[in-house]
């Protein structure tokens, strides 16, 4: 390949990781992003009033079982130990999530052992539901009406804007209960937070002489001719000017407020009742427990359907969306010299570790395709 110029659209984890891998192999990489900052939705910044590090687009906690990815991020940031312990306000009480032995004993006013709790939950479950088809049936089958209505029903309606009876059972993976006192929200081997924030980490990944970044810059289709390859991490439907219509997303609204002292005593407090309009309140200084701040910055988080001018967060991927997605995939699969990557480019919800793993794989695949004089695929991951 004589032309070693690469264009990357989007300066989130997908874009900068691919850029770094290719820059180290001698490619000249230009990253563009329509926003006025790098980092995508992982962007964080200091609040000028309190000096608290704020996760601008909502909380991002790094958790993975992938040692390669963990070692990768540790090259670019000092990762501090961090365990996500989520609380939930339900019926005037505060409980620990995920539902664990403490939650069960508190909720049912009992002192069950693990085996007794297992028997209790089994008894509460609706065994008449043999093959759960919906989120609601899955919850009723595994945890019963009381826990479902207290912790899942209202929260799910607020989060997805749909009744749990309309959502697929697959959203509620397996039995969402622990029969011990473990209240670590994640099960992953490696968990942490970058000491200086995600923005600094992403800046460090992008800090290479062969990488240039242009912000507040839209991608122009005619630019493709100037580059050997384009990696596009923007919305797939936007690339085609929404010609078949818009793929459905949920978006988030954040109501920011400051407080002197501690507002809620934890990083994340879920509000499970349908009567409370927000899904949760996050208190950002608790995401950096190694720091000390007198003031506090909190976000009330609201979920709703994503409009034309909103930031897309969660791909809906229901039946109608999947039919529309298929039309865009058919268009994309006829392209050459472009690869769609990341959450928006592949219309999939991705945690940060998966995003990084896929970006590393995509860069390797590109280098291999060049070495073997093969065509680089438009998608490097399953998207259907």
Swiss-Prot record:
Any Gene Ontology biological process: O antigen biosynthetic process
Positions with a binding annotation for UDP-alpha-D-galactose: 84, 151, 156, 160, 185, 270, 280, 314, 349
Known partners and oligomeric status: Homodimer.
An example Gene Ontology CC term for this record: cytosol
Residues that, per the record, bind FAD: 14, 33-34, 41, 60-61, 219, 343, 350-355
Reaction catalyzed: UDP-alpha-D-galactose = UDP-alpha-D-galactofuranose
Protein name according to UniProt: Probable UDP-galactopyranose mutase
Cofactor remark: Binds 1 FAD per subunit.
Range of residues in the leader sequence: 1-19
Family: Belongs to the UDP-galactopyranose/dTDP-fucopyranose mutase family.
Organism: Klebsiella pneumoniae
Keyword terms: FAD, Flavoprotein, Isomerase, Lipopolysaccharide biosynthesis, Signal
Function (record text): Catalyzes the interconversion through a 2-keto intermediate of uridine diphosphogalactopyranose (UDP-GalP) into uridine diphosphogalactofuranose (UDP-GalF).
Pathway per the UniProt entry: Bacterial outer membrane biogenesis; LPS O-antigen biosynthesis
Cofactors that this protein relies on: FAD
Gene Ontology molecular functions: flavin adenine dinucleotide binding; UDP-galactopyranose mutase activity
Highest taxon in the source lineage: Bacteria
EC numbers: 5.4.99.9
Gene3D superfamilies: NAD(P)-binding Rossmann-like Domain (3.40.50.720)
């Amino acid at each position: 390949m004589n032309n070693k110029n690469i264009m990357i659209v989007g300066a989130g984890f997908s874009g900068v990781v691919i850029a770094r891998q290719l820059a180290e192999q001698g490619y000249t990489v230009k990253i563009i992003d329509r926003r006025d900052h790098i980092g995508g939705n992982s962007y964080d910044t200091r609040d000028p009033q309190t000096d608290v590090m704020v996760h601008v687009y909502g909380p991002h906690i790094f958790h993975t079982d992938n040692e390669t990815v963990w070692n990768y991020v540790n090259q670019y940031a000092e990762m501090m130990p961090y365990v996500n312990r989520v609380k939930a306000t339900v019926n005037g009480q505060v409980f620990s999530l995920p539902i664990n032995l403490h939650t069960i004993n508190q909720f049912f006013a009992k002192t069950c052992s693990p085996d007794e709790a297992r028997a209790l939950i089994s008894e509460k479950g609706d065994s008449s539901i043999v093959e759960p088809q919906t989120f609601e049936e899955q919850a009723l089958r595994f945890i019963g009406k009381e826990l479902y209505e207290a912790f899942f029903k209202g929260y799910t309606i607020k989060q997805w804007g749909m009744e749990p009876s309309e959502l697929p059972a697959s959203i509620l993976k397996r039995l969402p209960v622990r029969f011990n006192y473990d209240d670590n929200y994640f099960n992953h081997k490696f968990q942490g937070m970058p000491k200086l924030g995600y923005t600094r980490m992403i800046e460090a990944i992008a800090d290479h002489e062969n990488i240039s970044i242009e912000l507040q810059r839209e991608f122009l289709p005619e630019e493709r001719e100037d580059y050997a390859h384009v990696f596009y991490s923007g919305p797939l439907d936007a690339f085609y000017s929404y010609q078949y219509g818009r793929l459905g997303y949920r978006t988030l609204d954040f109501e920011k407020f400051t407080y002197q002292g501690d507002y809620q005593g934890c990083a994340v407090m879920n509000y499970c009742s349908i009567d409370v309009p927000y899904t949760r309140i996050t208190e950002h200084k608790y995401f950096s427990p190694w720091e000390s701040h007198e003031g506090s910055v909190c976000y009330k988080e609201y979920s709703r359907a994503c409009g034309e001018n909103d930031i897309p967060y969660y791909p809906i991927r229901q039946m109608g969306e999947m039919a529309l997605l298929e039309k865009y995939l058919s268009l994309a699969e006829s392209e050459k010299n472009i690869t769609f990557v990341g959450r928006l480019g592949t219309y999939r919800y991705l945690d940060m570790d998966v995003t990084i793993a896929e970006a590393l794989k995509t860069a390797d695949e590109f280098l291999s395709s060049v070495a073997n004089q093969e065509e680089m695929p438009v998608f490097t991951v399953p998207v259907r």
